[in-house]
Every structure is written in C-alpha cells, then in structure tokens.
Amino acid sequence: MRLNAEFLSQVPSFISPLKETELDLRWYQIPIIENLGVLRDVHDAIDFTDNDIRYLGNFPRMKRLQTLLCGNNRITAIAPDIGKVLPNLKTLSLAQNHLQEIADLDPLASCPQLTNLSCIDNPVAQKQYYRLYLIWRIPSLHILDFERVRRNERLRAEEVFGQIQNPTEIASSIMGVKSRVFDLAALVQSHPEANSPITTGYTLTPEEREKIKEAIKNASSIAEINRLEAMLLEGKIPK
C-alpha cells in the first residue's frame, strides 16, 4: 500500500488513552513513508506498527508530532535529519526491526525532546554497550526499553564514553561502525518498473539510474554512501 493523498484522507484518526490525536496506519504493508505533508501536521501520534518500512525518514516538518510507533517493520536505517523535521518527538518505538549497529541509532541524538525509546528485539540490542551508549548519546532519555534511566547509569556512561565533544576511544570505535544497510545499485536494478517503492511519485529514467549508479561507484566514504541511500529512498537524484 502506497501512502498517497487519497489513501491518507481515508485513514481513521482517534483520541488515544493518552489524549493524543493519533493516526492509525497499522497493518497496511506500507513500504515507504511518503506524502505526509497532506496531513497538515494535525496529529500528536502516528502508528506505523506492522508494516514493511525499511527506512525511517522522508518526513515533512511536523512540529506537533510527539509519538511515533514503528514496531514490527523492517527498519535498518534512520534519516540523519529526523530531529530537524520532528523537533518535538518524545516517544519512539522501533521494537522488532532490523537495526544492526549502535551507530545506526546516532541520528536520534538530534531529537532534543526524545524521552522514551524502545529498540527491543533488534540485533543492535544485543551489542555490548548498547544501553550505556544510548544513555550517553541521547541525554534527554528517561526511559529506554521500558526501563527508567538511572543516575548511576548516566555517570557510568560519562565515565566510559567521555564528553560528546571529546569522546573516548571506546565511543569513537562505536561511532565508526555503521551498517552499510543497502546495496543501492541492486535496489535501482531490481525496481525498474513504474511507481517503484524506492521512489516518490515518478519513474526513474535510464539517465537517472545511470547517474545514481555512477555516484555509488564514486562514493569515497561510508558517510557518502549513507547520504546516497537517504537520497534514493526519498526519491532524490544526485546532481
């Protein structure tokens, strides 16, 4: 199911037990987040539980949104601008997804209001330093995986990882390991048809596909690869 304007206009909203205006997008097999600008930022919460989303990104600026439920999807990457476009996000559920490395969660450090985060049943949750690193990297957190963040954990995190501006070797080593979550060339080649799930509203021309493949081939760093991943999944073409 694609998130087009007609579909979004028919999706039910309701007042949740937390007194939030919530949009219910559960169980629609949604592959990509798109076209949310038509909602006009009138929701406090959006529930994307039980879909097929792989990339947590492509949001318009939504100042009202405080709760985002994305459990049981296929998410492997988070947009680096998530804190900029969702500045008041407080609660985020990423339970039962495919997040692999601790540094894959680094974009959440840009969310200044994030107090409640769940990443249980992701491979990353089994990593050494997972909990301690997130407490250090996201100082606003009060609850992580349904457990309250304690003062002694904050002190221990600072002891292990140092200051954000001056991280220890352990912190730097964690920051340097990020999943190469997609083979972009394979994605482009495997979705040549119109209305591909990796685009947002138009078909890639042969020239655009070649441009993307050339950009991938010339990428010189993981950061550049990640930038190209984000551009492709948001339907943007490298210049």
From Swiss-Prot:
Q: Name one Pfam family in it.
A: LRR_9
Would I find Repeat among this entry's keywords?
yes
Query: Which InterPro entries is this protein grouped with?
Result: Leu-rich_rpt, LRR_dom_sf, RU2A
Subcellular location(s) per record: Nucleus
Q: Where is the LRRCT domain?
A: 122-160
Q: Which GO terms describe its molecular function?
A: U2 snRNA binding
LRR repeats (start-end): 19-40, 42-63, 64-85, 88-109
A single GO BP annotation from the record?
A: mRNA cis splicing, via spliceosome
Tell me where it mainly resides.
Answer: nucleus
Q: Where are the transmembrane segments?
A: none
The entry's keywords:
Leucine-rich repeat, mRNA processing, mRNA splicing, Nucleus, Repeat, Spliceosome
- What Gene Ontology terms describe where this protein resides (cellular component)? cytosol; nucleus; post-mRNA release spliceosomal complex; spliceosomal complex; U2 snRNP; U2-type prespliceosome
User: Subunit structure, briefly?
Assistant: Belongs to the 40S cdc5-associated complex (or cwf complex), a spliceosome sub-complex reminiscent of a late-stage spliceosome composed of the U2, U5 and U6 snRNAs and at least brr2, cdc5, cwf2/prp3, cwf3/syf1, cwf4/syf3, cwf5/ecm2, spp42/cwf6, cwf7/spf27, cwf8, cwf9, cwf10, cwf11, cwf12, prp45/cwf13, cwf14, cwf15, cwf16, cwf17, cwf18, cwf19, cwf20, cwf21, cwf22, cwf23, cwf24, cwf25, cwf26, cyp7/cwf27, cwf28, cwf29/ist3, lea1, msl1, prp5/cwf1, prp10, prp12/sap130, prp17, prp22, sap61, sap62, sap114, sap145, slu7, smb1, smd1, smd3, smf1, smg1 and syf2.
What task does this protein carry out? Involved in pre-mRNA splicing. This protein is associated with sn-RNP U2. It helps the A' protein to bind stem loop IV of U2 snRNA.
Write out the similarity annotation: Belongs to the U2 small nuclear ribonucleoprotein A family.
| Protein name according to UniProt | U2 small nuclear ribonucleoprotein A'
The organism that produces this protein has a lineage beginning with: Eukaryota, Fungi, Dikarya, Ascomycota, Taphrinomycotina
The gene coding this protein? lea1
